């Protein structure tokens, strides 16, 4: 299967790039980022605050399957509908620091659209830590499944 | 030597994955501290550490009589499996965005 989402993280750099082509017109793609109700649906998070303007800010609260609450917040620096969002992003209480995110939205010829996210971390170590998290999580999932299988019935 | 294949063999073993998981959350650990997390005999864990080090998934540092191990993040990133869960997470999220917006459009 074709990989629609691409991630580029070069060694020793403190940023990463995420890019994706959507089978959606540009206006709908941007709307998915602009409307709290829609953000809530696709991110699977509670949107506690979302003030989409320069100097505005956002606050999300997500509950993991174990019931732990996780907070995310940031400040908006640039908000150009259908074009660009520049904002800070912080996973509260995690050692990843504050990220500077630049989201570039663009239209593609056949009614599709693309999104390119550049995320700059405060250090290479923090970026690597963030990249490692789903890997570690995946490992622990594999480990848990293994434990379930091996568990005497 | 086919290093790439070796790396995948290395992470195919559940004990070695568990060692990598353990080390993913700390800067470094001694062989003894790693072994203390497992029921397996110390020589078994040493063997796993040797394999992981040979595949460049771990770095070894000797200070005095203790050998410290840490994840070799540089090499791990070259292993598709390392970055793949992160990519898959975003793929999943964006697929959801696409389906939410397709429903929204047809409303």
What are the roles of these predicted feature ranges?
Chain A
Residues 17-18, 36-71:
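Short beta-edge strand/loop motif at the mouth of beta-sheet-based domains
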Residues 1-46:
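Hydrophobic ligand-binding cavity/cleft-lining segments
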Residues 20, 48, 72-78, 89, ...:
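Hydrophobic/aromatic beta-strand elements that line small-molecule binding cavities or substrate pockets
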Residues 151-153:
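Short, highly charged C-terminal tails/helix-capping segments
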Residues 13-19, 57, 71, 84, ...:
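Intrinsic-disorder/low-complexity, polar/charged segments enriched in Ser/Thr/Lys/Arg/Asp/Glu/Gln
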Residues 93-137:
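Beta-strand/loop substructures that line and gate deep hydrophobic ligand-binding cavities in soluble
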Residues 29-33, 39, 58-60, 76, ...:
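Hydrophobic pocket/interface hotspot
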Residues 26, 77-83, 104-114:
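A short, structured loop/turn motif at beta-sheet edges
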